[in-house]
Swiss-Prot record:
Lineage per the UniProt record: Bacteria, Bacillati, Actinomycetota, Actinomycetes, Mycobacteriales
Function: Generates Z-farnesyl diphosphate (Z-FPP) from isopentenyl pyrophosphate (IPP). Z-FPP is the precursor of decaprenyl diphosphate, which has a central role in the biosynthesis of the mycobacterial cell wall.
Pfam families: Prenyltransf
Enzyme class: transferase
Annotated keywords: Cell shape, Cell wall biogenesis/degradation, Magnesium, Metal-binding, Peptidoglycan synthesis, Transferase
A Gene Ontology cellular-component term: plasma membrane
NCBIfam families noted in UniProt: PRK14828.1, uppS
Binding site for substrate: 41-45, 86-88, 92, 211, 217-219
Binding-site residues, Mg(2+): 40, 230
Cofactor: Mg(2+)
Protein name, per record: Short-chain Z-isoprenyl diphosphate synthase
Length: 262
C-alpha cells in the first residue's frame, strides 16, 4: 500500500523542489562548476515498466538528457559531462546496439541544436561506432560555438583506461617526433603531460559525479579526472530522474567539505 496517495505526489514533489531551490539560493550554497553524470538504468526502467523492447527505455532516457542539461544551465553550472556509451556497451547484442547508437546520435544532434547555444565536445573514440554515426556526431558538434557560457561533453565510445593509455601514447609520440632520448621520454611522463593529452584537455575536472540506478562505482568513467570528485548515488533509474533528485545532489554537494586527498 502506498503511503502517499498518487494525487498528492506531484504537488508534494513540487513543494519539495521549491524548498530545495530556495534553500540553495538563500544560503548562497557552493555549487559545482563541473558535473559528470552516468545515465544508468534505462534497460532496467523499461523492464520494470513492463516493456519487452528495452530500446523504449533508451528513448525515454534520451529525452531526459536535454532536460537535465537545462537544469544544470539554470542552476549556473558551467560544464556537464554525460556518459552515453562506453566501450563495454559496444559488446551488446548487435540489434540492441544499433538502436542505441541511433538514439544517441539523435540525442547529440538535439543537444547541438543552434537554439541551445551550448558548446559541445565529444569525448571518446567515435571510430568505434561506424562511419555514418561518427560523421553525424562530428558534424553536429562542429556546428556548436567554440566558446559559450555552458559547455557539454558527451562521452560516446568512451573507456577510462583506453583514454589514459591513449594519452600516454600521444605524449610519447610527440616527444619521439621531437627527437627525445629514452631518458627524456621517461621524464616527459608527468601528471601535467598526461592531462594535456586526455579527451578533456584544458577543462576542469568534475567536482561532482552523479550516478543513477543504484550502482556505486565509476565503471571506467573519467577515471583520471574524477580522482577527487565528490560522488552522489541514487536508486532512481535514469528515465525517472527528476529535478528534485538533481537539486538534492546539489544540496548534498554544498554540504560537503572537499579535502582533495589532504
Amino acid at each position: 500500500m502506498e503511503i502517499i496517495p498518487p494525487r498528492l505526489k506531484e504537488p508534494l514533489y513540487a513543494l519539495y523542489e521549491l524548498r530545495l531551490r530556495q534553500g540553495l539560493t538563500a544560503s548562497e550554497s557552493r555549487l559545482p562548476r563541473h558535473i559528470a553524470v552516468l545515465c544508468d538504468g534505462n534497460r532496467r526502467w523499461a523492464r520494470d515498466a513492463g516493456y519487452d523492447d528495452v530500446s523504449y527505455g533508451y528513448r525515454m532516457g534520451a529525452a531526459k538528457i536535454a532536460e537535465m542539461l537545462r537544469w544544470c544551465q539554470e542552476a549556473g553550472i558551467e560544464m556537464t559531462t554525460v556518459y552515453l556509451l562506453s566501450t563495454e556497451n559496444l559488446q551488446r547484442d548487435p540489434d540492441e546496439l544499433a538502436a542505441l547508437i541511433e538514439i544517441i546520435t539523435d540525442v547529440v544532434e538535439e543537444i547541438c541544436a543552434p537554439a541551445n547555444r551550448w558548446s559541445v565536445r565529444t569525448v571518446g573514440d567515435l571510430e568505434l561506432l561506424g562511419e555514418e554515426p561518427a560523421c553525424r556526431l562530428r558534424g553536429a558538434v562542429e556546428s556548436t560555438p567554440g566558446v559559450a557560457p555552458f559547455h557539454v561533453n558527451v562521452a560516446v565510445g568512451y573507456g577510462g583506461r583506453r583514454e589514459i593509455v591513449g594519452a600516454v601514447r600521444a605524449l610519447l609520440g610527440k616527444e619521439l617526433a621531437n627527437g627525445a632520448t629514452a631518458e627524456e621520454l621517461v621524464e616527459a611522463v608527468t601528471v601535467e603531460g598526461i592531462a594535456r593529452n586526455l579527451y578533456t584537455s584544458g577543462q576542469p575536472d568534475p567536482d561532482l559525479v552523479i550516478r543513477t540506478s543504484g550502482e556505486q562505482r565509476l565503471s571506467g568513467f573519467l577515471l583520471w579526472q574524477s580522482a577527487y570528485s565528490e560522488m552522489w548515488f541514487t536508486e532512481t533509474h535514469w528515465p525517472a530522474f527528476r529535478r528534485v533528485d538533481f537539486l538534492r545532489a546539489l544540496r548534498d554537494y554544498s554540504m560537503r567539505h572537499r579535502r582533495y586527498g589532504k
